[in-house]
């Protein structure tokens, strides 16, 4: 595939390319290229304390960036990879701080998209946060990427994303203690005793994960409390900053009459379905 060869060359020379996955399109760069990673943060207007997700095509690639897996982590990976599930794992020292926002953990997943996997097999691990301006809805086809970054932006077109929703992000119990930033003492908060923590809901549900043990959510209130503290422990994207906010007026409607009066560009939220 000539197009993939072009993308591989661009990435290997330090470029940034939008790539398809089954969830959303991502802005990809080599995981070892600091300048390219910084370019992603600049393009997205993404805060540097918001960690990136690394994409891999195999367990061998995973072993390049993550410490050995626990039995629980391996069982979950065998069940859901490739697929829309990101695991937060203890990182190897060679992983750049720019990727992890200075955390001792790294977020990793294996996408369920043949074109993306083909690319990853040729390039090795890639960082690939959603290919949009931070805070806006994520792109599920190339036109969405072009809306944010222009018609000439390099894109590997893989068609419309089959899922169209970001991956579920989790950590397993033995890794909960590893989410503090480097050179900062652990805070006094008692670590979770659940087997699995869901940091960001997505295509893989709590019910599916409960097959592997007890599951809890990292709540919005806990995220707010942690980010306001002197030791923010926010190991996952989607915990600290606004996400998926459309550029449209929102109208709260209480009757069917007001629905017909709403403009075509509004997002309509009905407070009382019985009035329909």
Question: Which sequence ranges carry the predicted segments?
Answer:
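Active-site-adjacent structural elements in enzyme catalytic cores
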Residues: 1-276
């Amino acid at each position: 595939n000539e197009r993939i060869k072009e993308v591989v060359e661009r990435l290997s020379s330090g470029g940034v390319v939008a790539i398809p996955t089954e969830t959303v399109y991502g802005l990809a760069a080599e995981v070892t290229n600091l300048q390219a990673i910084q370019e992603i943060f600049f393009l997205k207007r993404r805060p540097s304390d918001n960690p990136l997700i690394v994409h891999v095509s195999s367990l061998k690639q995973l072993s390049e960036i993550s410490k050995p897996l626990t039995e629980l982590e391996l069982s979950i990976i065998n069940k859901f990879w490739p697929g829309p599930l990101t695991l937060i794992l203890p990182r190897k020292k060679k992983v750049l701080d720019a990727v992890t926002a200075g955390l001792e953990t790294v977020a990793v997943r294996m996408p369920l998209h043949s074109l993306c996997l083909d690319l990853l097999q040729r390039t090795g691990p890639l960082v690939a946060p959603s290919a949009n301006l931070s805070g806006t809805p994520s792109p599920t086809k190339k036109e969405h990427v072009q809306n944010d970054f222009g018609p000439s932006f390099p894109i590997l077109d893989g068609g419309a994303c089959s899922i169209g929703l970001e991956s579920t992000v989790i950590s397993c119990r033995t890794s909960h203690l590893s989410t503090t930033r480097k050179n900062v003492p652990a805070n006094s908060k008692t670590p979770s005793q659940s087997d699995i923590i869901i940091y960001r809901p997505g295509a893989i549900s709590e019910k599916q994960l409960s097959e592997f043990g007890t599951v809890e959510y990292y709540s919005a209130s806990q995220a707010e409390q942690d980010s306001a503290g002197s030791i923010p422990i926010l190991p996952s994207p989607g915990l600290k900053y606004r996400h998926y906010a459309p550029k449209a007026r929102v109208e709260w409607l209480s009757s069917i009459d007001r629905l017909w009066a709403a403009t075509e560009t509004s997002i309509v939220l009905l407070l009382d379905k019985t009035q329909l």
